[in-house]
């Protein structure tokens, strides 16, 4: 039986109730924590990665911007873990849903913009009008800059959705081709299976990179407004 190409992107249900909530709550449970003074290698590596990422993102921020550090670290860990779990066979990836990505992008973007308008109102308004703009073009440029400002959360969500969805579709197509040719052409099957393994490794990197890019862009929006 041929499976629908987009079947893996349909949110699963349990007894008619959406299971996406349980899937979203799963990543925090997989992050190991330690109650001991001496940590094992896994927790030590995890703490090192968190400190390295935090240093990369928060160096450019002032004291007000650094108050967001905990939220940004939670965001990158959540997205990365969710993306990696979605690479498991017969699993569901919440970040392929535009609605969920918008639910993450809009509040974070709105919080950063609101912070800018509250603390630096003049500077925030100055972003809507580039310096040296000719007087006849001022109304048009203000409208364009305002539209581009409101497009930012949509661009964040669409970028994450498109990259994760494209990778899953490509893996699904190559996996289906491998299965279909396994009984007819063994040499070609081995070649395609090797390509599938390489693509899976690439998708693991993409899952981590997209989590970093999403969080980094939120951090840049915050930096512009603090």
UniProtKB/Swiss-Prot annotation:
The keyword Mitochondrion appears for this protein: yes
Gene3D superfamilies: ATP synthase, F0 complex, subunit A
Organism: Gorilla gorilla gorilla (Western lowland gorilla)
Classification via Pfam families: ATP-synt_A
Keyword Transport: yes
A single cellular component GO annotation: mitochondrial inner membrane
Taxonomic placement: Eukaryota, Metazoa, Chordata, Craniata, Vertebrata
Signal peptide positions on this chain: none
The protein's name: ATP synthase F(0) complex subunit a
């Amino acid at each position: 039986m041929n499976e629908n190409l987009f079947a893996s992107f349909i949110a699963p249900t349990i007894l008619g109730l959406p299971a996406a909530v349980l899937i979203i709550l799963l990543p925090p449970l997989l992050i190991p924590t330690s109650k001991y003074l001496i940590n094992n290698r896994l927790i030590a590596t995890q703490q090192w990665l968190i400190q390295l990422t935090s240093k990369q993102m928060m160096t450019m921020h002032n004291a007000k911007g650094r108050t967001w550090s905990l939220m940004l670290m939670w965001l990158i860990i959540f997205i990365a873990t969710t993306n990696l779990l979605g690479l498991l066979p017969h699993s569901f990836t919440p970040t392929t849903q535009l609605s969920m990505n918008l639910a993450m992008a809009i509040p974070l973007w709105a919080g950063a913009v609101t912070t800018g308008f509250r603390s630096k109102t003049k500077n925030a308004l100055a972003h809507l009008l580039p310096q040296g703009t000719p007087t006849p073009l001022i109304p048009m440029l203000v409208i364009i800059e305002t539209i581009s400002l409101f497009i930012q959360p949509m661009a964040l969500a669409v970028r994450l959705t498109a990259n994760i969805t494209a990778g899953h579709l490509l893996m699904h197509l190559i996996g289906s081709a491998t299965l279909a040719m396994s009984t007819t052409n063994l040499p070609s099957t081995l070649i395609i299976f090797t390509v599938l393994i390489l693509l899976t490794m690439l998708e693991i990197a993409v899952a981590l990179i997209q989590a970093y890019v999403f969080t980094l862009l939120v951090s840049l929006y915050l930096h512009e407004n603090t």
